[in-house]
Structures are given as C-alpha cells and as structure tokens.
C-alpha cells in the first residue's frame, strides 16, 4: 500500500503540489491524470524518492520514502516515461548493474536476472548493446529493471 499524506512541494514561491492525499491499494491499477503543470511528475518523483517534499509524507508499506528511502525503495519498482538506460552496456550488464543497485544478494542475482529477463521477454537480446535495440526492447529493459 502507498499512502500520500498532506504532500506539498514548493519551488520558491511556486506551489507545485498542494496538500495532496491519496492511498493506493495493493493489487489494483490506477491512473494518475491531469493537465500539464498539475504536479503529476513532481508527485511521482517524490513518491519514488527522486525528489524531496516540502511537507507531508509518502509511506510505502509503512516505510517513509523520505526517512527510510532504502527500505521504501525495496518495496517498489518505477519505470519513468524515458527510462535512464546506459546505451553502451549490454542488456545483461545493465541488469547486473540494476540488481547491484537494488542490493540483490550476489548468490541470487543471476537467477533473479534470468527470471526477469524471461518474464519481460528480453532473454534473447541480453548480449546486445542497449543502443542497438528497438524502442520497444528498450522499454522492456526499463520495465525489467523496475521489476
């Protein structure tokens, strides 16, 4: 479960997010819609720990993303619209890099990567450089690192 409580983000005098409250229940699919400049990206960046809040809290399965970022981030995966891929890495190298960042134990890393690559159907391209993949395959690689 993700709980957003009284979330506020200010950039100087500009109020980007104004006392936002909502709950995301596990096992459901939600849409996050609004016009340009409504604060959607800012909210998502706060929820995933990429940006700090001015006020409020974001709890991910009870862990505050601002106070316990490592514990909270273990609970979620996030795929931005344009995933930050390293184009000069092979798919496998990138997956190993992502697994290391997520602190997946070395003993479980290879099996975990294999499972995810099969799940998102990128196993057959794991030796290719990311820069040589189609946009669709790059999106799959981004999804794989989020899982």
Give the location of each predicted region.
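ABC transporter nucleotide-binding domains
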Residues: 2-4, 9-147
């Amino acid at each position: 479960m993700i709980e957003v409580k009284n979330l506020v983000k200010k950039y100087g005098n500009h109020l980007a997010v104004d006392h936002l409250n909502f709950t995301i229940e596990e096992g459901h699919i939600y849409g996050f819609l609004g016009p340009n400049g409504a604060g959607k990206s800012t909210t998502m960046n706060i929820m995933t720990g990429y940006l700090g809040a001015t006020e409020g809290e974001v709890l991910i399965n009870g862990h505050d993303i601002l106070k316990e970022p490592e514990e909270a981030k273990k609970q979620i995966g996030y795929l931005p619209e344009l995933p930050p891929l390293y184009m000069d890495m092979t798919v496998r190298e990138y997956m190993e890099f992502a697994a290391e960042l997520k602190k997946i134990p070395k003993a479980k890393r290879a099996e975990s990567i294999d499972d995810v690559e099969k799940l998102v159907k990128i196993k057959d391209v794991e030796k290719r450089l990311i820069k040589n993949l189609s946009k669709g395959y790059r999106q799959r690689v981004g999804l794989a690192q989020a899982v």
